[in-house]
Amino acid sequence: MALRIEDKKAIVAEVAEQVSSALSAAVADYRGLTVNEMTSLRKQARESGVYLRVVRNNLARLAIKGTDFECLGDALKGPLVLALSKDEPGAAAKLFKSFQKDHNAFEVKNLAMSGELFGPEKLDDFAKLPTREEALATLLNVMQAPVTKFVRTLNEIPSQAVRVFAAVGDSK
């Protein structure tokens, strides 16, 4: 069934709104998947905070025009599902990677982040991106390390003195 112009405008507006706040994007070929498998993918996407939409390529090109994901424009060929990571940059890649393990027909085509287009070989790298909390924890550990080492060094001086006095006391 053909879409009316109003429906097309609504789809473009919805996708453009989601794209404007997305951190990363992934597109995959879904040919060969059953309805139940696509429903399962959509459910997993909702649970992981990923916006997932099957959208016509021309409408997707209009929606991403003028955004960081405009680089995906030439990669939109064939029946594709568009996934946008909203909260965590690697969420869409993690979703596609886990789904691809169980479904051979599902093929990731491209990934995009910060205006750069990446091929499917970067899926593992994107999936390994830390969450915001993990990145903050790592940063905090890096910032705390010198202070912690300094405190341990200061604490070692009295400990060493006690060991010296104990050794002197044991020798007498």
Curated annotation (Swiss-Prot):
Gene Ontology annotations of biological process type: translation
Keyword Ribonucleoprotein: yes
A single GO cellular-component term on record: ribonucleoprotein complex
Classification via Pfam families: Ribosomal_L10
Metal-binding listed as a keyword: no
GO terms for MF: large ribosomal subunit rRNA binding
Keyword set, alphabetical order: Ribonucleoprotein, Ribosomal protein, RNA-binding, rRNA-binding
InterPro entries hit by this protein: Ribosomal_uL10, Ribosomal_uL10-like_sf, Ribosomal_uL10_bac, Ribosomal_uL10_bac_type
Subunit structure: Part of the ribosomal stalk of the 50S ribosomal subunit. The N-terminus interacts with L11 and the large rRNA to form the base of the stalk. The C-terminus forms an elongated spine to which L12 dimers bind in a sequential fashion forming a multimeric L10(L12)X complex.
Function: Forms part of the ribosomal stalk, playing a central role in the interaction of the ribosome with GTP-bound translation factors.
Assigned protein family: Belongs to the universal ribosomal protein uL10 family.
Protein name: Large ribosomal subunit protein uL10
Organism: Francisella philomiragia subsp. philomiragia (strain ATCC 25017 / CCUG 19701 / FSC 153 / O#319-036)
